[in-house]
Amino acid sequence: MMLEPSPPPLTTTVTPSLPSSLKKSVTDNDQNNNNVPRKRKLACQNCRRRRRKCNMEKPCSNCIKFRTECVFTQQDLRNKRYSTTYVEALQSQIRSLKEQLQILSSSSSTIASNALSSLKNNSDHGDAPNEKILKYGETAQSALPSSESNDENESDAFTKKMPSESPPPVGTNSIYPSNSLSIIKKKTDGSTRYQQQQVSLKNLSRSPLILRSLSLFFKWLYPGHYLFIHRETFLSAFFGDTNTKSYYCSEELVFAIAALGSLISYKSETELFQQSEVFYQRAKTIVLKKIFQLEDSSLAESSSSSKLAIIQTLLCLAFYDIGSGENPMAWYLSGLAFRIAHEIGLHLNPEAWSNVYEDELSIMDFEVRSRIYWGCYIADHLIAILFGRSTSLRLSNSTVPETDELPEIETGIEEYIYDPKVILSTANPLKKLIVLSRITEIFASKIFSPNETLLQRSEYLAKFNLEVYNWRRDLPPELQWTKRSLMEMTDFNPTIAYVWFHYYIVLISYNKPFIYEIKQSRELVEGYVDELYYLLKVWKNKFKTFEKATIYMIYSAILAIQCMKSNLIKKDRKQDFLNFLSAPTLNYELARKFIENSEDALHNSETMDLLGTLSHGNDFALEYNFDFTLLNEIDMLIGGNTNDGLSK
C-alpha cells in the first residue's frame, strides 16, 4: 500500500508531494559508477567503534586478530547534506501521517477503511507517476535523494510546487464538520457580554438564597442522577477561580441548580422554598432565549465549550419537571440537551475534541467533558426507563472514554458536601451504571418486541435478569448491599443509595409487564418491593422527614404500588409506600399528583393520567410495537423479489 499522502476525507492537513527532481535515487548513482573503481574511504565498523587503524582489507588485520566479523559500510554519507526545504517537506509528511493515523484510530472501521482506500487510490493515481514514493516497509534512506540533487534550481522548483495554502477539507458525508452544525460567521467582540456575565455571577455568589440552595443541592441530591455536573469545576468557576474555565458555570445553570436545591428546603424556610419556582422560570427563560435566539443571539457566536452549561441547565430543568409531574416538558428539554451534546461532538473521543473547542484544553478539561457526557448518558437512560421510551445516546456511537476520578477541592466547600470527612467517589458508581444502562439497551428491543412469542420474550427476560444479577454481585464492596444488610442498616448514605434505587427502577420496570405471565418476574418484583421498604425505613429512621428525598425514591415507590395493585404481589407494604408519597414533608408535586390520580381513579374512569401526553410510562411495548407494513412495501420497491429469494 502506498503511503504518499494526499488529503483523505478525515483531515484538513495537506502534505505537498516531493518533486521527482528531489527524489533521485541513490541506487541510480551506484549503477552509473559501477565501472569506476574506488578505494574504500571508511574503516570497518569494528575498527571505527574501537578507534583502531584499519588496513582497509576485507577482512582487515584487526578483525582477523580479534576474531570478529569484518563489516564495511557501503556508503559514505558524511558529506551528504539535504536542503532545509527538503527536510521540512519530510517533516510535514510525517506530521500528516500521524494526524491521519490518530483520526483513523478513533474512527469506526468503515470510516478507517474508506480513508485507507482513499490513500491507496490517491497514491496509485498520483500526479507524478514517475516519482520514487516512500512505500510501506521501505527504509527512509532508500528514498532520500543523493547529494547531487540538492542544487539551487531543484530547491526553487520544490518551493514553487508547494501550495501556498491548504485547500478546504473534503470532510465527512455531511457538508458540515462533526463538531458543530453552525455556519461560521464573523464573531463580534464578546468582551462586554463576558464582563456582564461575570458581574452577574459575582452578584449571585453573594446571594444568601442562592448559596443556601446550591448547598442543599450538592449536599443531598448530588451526585445521584446529576452526574453530568462536576461539582468542583462548577463551584470554582462560580466563585471566580481564575484557574478554572469560566464556561463551566453560567447564570442559567446557577438558577437551575438553585431551583432543585430550594425545592428540598424546609417549608418553614418560606422565602427560600417559594423561590424554587422563581429560580426555575428564570433559568428556563434565559436558556430558551439563548437556544432559540429570542432577544439573545449570543449562542450563535459562542464556542462549543460555552454550550456545556446549556446542556447541564436543560437536564436540571428536565428533572425539575419530572419531580413536578410535568413529563412532556421534561421530555422536550432533555431531548434538546442530548441534541446539543451531539451537535458539539461531546460523544467523541478526546482526540477529536482538539478540533472542536477553540480554547486550549488541559487533561482536566478532557476528564470533565467525559464526566459530563457519561452523566448525560445515564440521565438519558433513566428518563427513557421512567417514560418507557427509547434512548437518544447510545454506547455504539460513543467513542469518549469512561470518566476517572477527578480531584476534589480540599477546603472551602464543606457546606456543599454531604459528609466532609468522607472522600466522595463518583467515577466507580458511574462506570457501573454505564454497564447497567448498556445491559438495558441491549435487551429492551428483544424483551418488548411484539414480533417475539411470549416464550422467546421470557427467555430474553430471564437472560436479562441473570445479567443484572451478575452486575449486582460484581459491585465493589463499598457499593454492595443485600436484603439482610438493609434490614440491619442504621445509616442512610444518599451518595451511595442512588445506585441501589437506579437498580430497583430498572429491574421493576422491566419485570412489571410480565408479572401476570411469568412466575420469576412476580417473585423478583416481590423481593425488590421488600428491599425498597427496608431502604425507605432506614431513611425515615435517620432523617424523620422527607424534604430531602429524591426522584429516585418517589419513582421506586410508585412502581412498587403499581405492582401491588395487580393483586399478584403481596400488599403488606402498600400502605407504607402510600404513606411515604402522601407525607406532608415530601415536596415533590409528582407524589401528590400520583396520590390524587389514584384516588380519582376509584371514582372516575376518565380521570387524567399521571403522565399526561406520555400516558404509557414504563410501557416499553408501546415503543417497540412496530407496524412493518410500510417497511415491507419499501423493501419490495428497493429489492423487488431479491429479499424473498434470500429468505428462502
UniProtKB/Swiss-Prot annotation:
Modified residues (Phosphoserine): 164, 166
GO biological process, one term: amino acid catabolic process
Keywords: Activator, DNA-binding, Metal-binding, Nucleus, Phosphoprotein, Transcription, Transcription regulation, Zinc
Predominant place of localization: nucleus
Composition bias type Low complexity, residue spans: 11-22
A Pfam family that the UniProt record links to this protein: Zn_clus
Signal peptide: none
Any one of the GO CC terms: nucleus
Record has Transcription regulation as a keyword: yes
Location of the DNA-binding region in this protein: 44-70
Alphabetized SUPFAM superfamilies for the sequence: Zn2/Cys6 DNA-binding domain (SSF57701)
Membrane is among the record's keywords: no
Subcellular location, record wording: Nucleus
Disordered, as annotated region: 1-37, 140-177
Superkingdom of origin: Eukaryota
Biased composition, class Pro residues, residue ranges: 1-10
Entry's transmembrane regions: none
InterPro entries: Transcr_Regulatory_Elem, Transcription_factor_dom_fun, Zn2-C6_fun-type_DNA-bd_sf, Zn2Cys6_DnaBD
Molecular functions per Gene Ontology: DNA-binding transcription factor activity; DNA-binding transcription factor activity, RNA polymerase II-specific; sequence-specific DNA binding; zinc ion binding
Function: Activates the CHA1 gene for L-serine dehydratase. Binds to the DNA sequence 5'-GVGGARAYRTRATTCCRC-3'.
Further comment found in the protein's record: Present with 396 molecules/cell in log phase SD medium.
PANTHER family attached to this UniProt entry: ACTIVATORY PROTEIN CHA4-RELATED, TY1 ENHANCER ACTIVATOR
Name the record gives this protein: Activatory protein CHA4
Protein's organism: Saccharomyces cerevisiae (strain ATCC 204508 / S288c) (Baker's yeast)
